[in-house]
Design a protein with these regions (language model features):
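Short SAM/SAH-binding signature in class I
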Residues: 169-179
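Heptad-repeat coiled-coil amphipathic alpha-helices that mediate oligomerization/assembly
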Residues: 1-54, 181
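Conserved class I S-adenosyl-L-methionine
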Residues: 85-95
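Class I SAM-dependent methyltransferase Rossmann-like catalytic core
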Residues: 50-84
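Conserved SAM-binding loop of SAM-dependent methyltransferases across substrates and taxa
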Residues: 96-108
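C-terminal substrate-binding/active-site "lid" region of AdoMet-derived donor-dependent transferases
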Residues: 181-248
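S-adenosyl-L-methionine
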Residues: 127-170
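Conserved SAM-binding motif I beta-strand of class I
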Residues: 110-117
Length: 248
């Protein structure tokens, strides 16, 4: 009988703990849903503001969720285009950011955009989206379907876009780094952008790194700032995190 009482008491304690755990899980789930709705609302607002800035309807822009550049990141890009007034832009990873840049710089015949993409199908898709929207409209634009090849940097070997045959400008005013894809097997996938293109960066150049809250991008930023101490970093509180690098 004593053993039965002990078992019943133990079961009761377990049930109480499970009830408490269930309440905590419900609270966490509600919090996640709340912040998910907040972020979604903010991004919808940013998308509308961006569309207004570009002078287009909201539906003119391709989808800006999932893997695509988020509206808040694209708003940062638009602000930097106004600030830097770039002649030459290079971006790593084509897509909605390419369309945004082409629209922002439309009609400026002295401007050039070079966009890398490791996947030829993605590059072609971006080209088709641009054509549907009547872009680049006078601005020079190259979408380079550049496969990943080995680059040796400081004795280390990295996979990054093939640059041979790509018409890179001698002076880059704005460098957008939103590719290659970072994975657990290649956390520093975006690191080569700065060491490989550093000598082409103009005096007024600005570097923008998307997804800067992730561990891989954080590791990339750490190495960049250690290896290139003449640069300083500003973190912008976008949904995925944006890092802006400028010369000191």
């Amino acid at each position: 009988q004593d053993t039965l009482k002990q078992l019943l008491s133990a079961v009761e304690r377990i049930e109480q703990r499970l009830d408490g755990l269930d309440q905590r899980l419900n609270m966490l789930a509600q919090r996640d849903v709340h912040w998910g709705l907040v972020f979604a609302t903010q991004q919808l607002e940013n998308r509308q503001i961006l569309s207004d800035r570009l002078g287009v309807s909201n539906g003119w822009l391709p989808p800006t969720r999932g893997w695509a550049a988020s509206p808040d990141f694209l708003m940062v890009v638009a602000r930097l285009v106004d600030e830097v007034q770039p002649t030459n832009v290079v971006e790593c990873g084509s897509g909605v950011s390419t369309i945004t840049l082409a629209r922002l710089l439309a009609g400026q015949s002295d401007c050039n955009i070079v966009s890398f993409d490791h996947n030829e199908a993605f590059a072609n898709q971006t080209a088709a989206l641009l054509q549907e929207r009547g872009l680049p409209d006078g601005t020079g634009l190259t979408i380079a379907a550049a496969p990943h090849v080995e680059h040796v940097i400081g004795g280390e070997t990295f996979l990054w876009y093939q640059t041979e045959g790509v018409p890179l400008p001698e002076q880059i005013d704005l460098l957008l780094v939103d590719g290659p894809i970072v994975s657990s097997d290649n956390m520093l996938a975006r690191y080569p952008a700065l060491p490989l293109l550093h000598d082409r960066l103009s005096d007024k150049a600005v570097i923008v790194l998307d997804d800067a809250n992730r561990p891989g991008e954080q590791a990339t930023l750490k190495r960049w700032l250690e290896e290139f101490p003449a640069w300083t970093c500003e973190m912008v509180g976008t949904e995925k995190g944006t890092a802006i690098l400028r010369r000191k």
